[in-house]
């Protein structure tokens, strides 16, 4: 440890890395707690405190130089970004996608059901007349694929996505057809839908 304290630039690097790790765990733990993943959040908090105890003493005792302070602040900001990126990659939980479309003849609900999504749809009325509204629940890791699919089927559709707090009953308790969602690509919609219709 004395080797680190005697080398100014190595100290800068150490402070930066320790703070990135600490704040990454802190950010992930906060997000996981808000999403309701209590036990995973508790495990992450263990690592967070471990880094805090082992590393922060070194960090705080060497903030007497401007470069160390800058490294500490920069590591903090990078740690937040890294933590959020990791959570995005994990894509925990589900997303509700609400779609409003004027194109009844496209039969979007059945097109999406053929691809493995659970769709609830109903008629609604706006300023310009009748519209079809669809509510679709999907795992977060398939959110982008779903939105690309909808845009390919109906480029003018109005789409809103948000995260539900609690889920109970319905299509999802019976088991989502994840294999279908995983296997297709939005660019290959026509052939996939034709295959599903023919197989029925």
Curated annotation (Swiss-Prot):
The chain crosses the membrane at residues 8-28, 40-60, 66-86. It is a multi-pass membrane protein. Signal peptide: none annotated. GO terms for cellular component: plasma membrane. CDD domains: YitT_C_like_1. Pfam families: DUF2179, DUF5698. It comes from the Bacteria. It is found in: Cell membrane. Keywords: Cell membrane, Membrane, Transmembrane, Transmembrane helix. Disulfide bonds: none annotated. PANTHER family: UPF0316 PROTEIN YEBE. Belongs to the UPF0316 family. HAMAP family: UPF0316. This is UPF0316 protein SAOUHSC_02131. It comes from Staphylococcus aureus (strain NCTC 8325 / PS 47).
